[in-house]
């Protein structure tokens, strides 16, 4: 699909982390995206690739949005210098990611040696942190249990 640069940036800012849902749901990652791991995914201190969700996000964008610019911006949102066509707009998506991740101090995907521990970290909506007054927040959520197919 054809989008203006502005529209592409908006879509990428909104969809850059959609892959977290796909990854946690056990969706299959196509080999063409798995092969991009070394290009777009940073490594943690143990030498393991992190932020694999961006590959799932790009796969989602390719299938549903069908726009190369949006796909490339989503892919580069953790390493914006990897998108050499326009690093400036890639850094906008990086900023959007940092703002939206403010609900958690440190991602389990970043710090843990376990490949599955990030699945236990709840994804919280950033707007849950907004307080309308000086009173203690009455934020409530419920844990979602894995589905039992038996």
Positions of PLM-derived features:
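Divalent metal-dependent catalytic cores for phosphoryl transfer on phosphate-bearing substrates
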Residues: 1-150
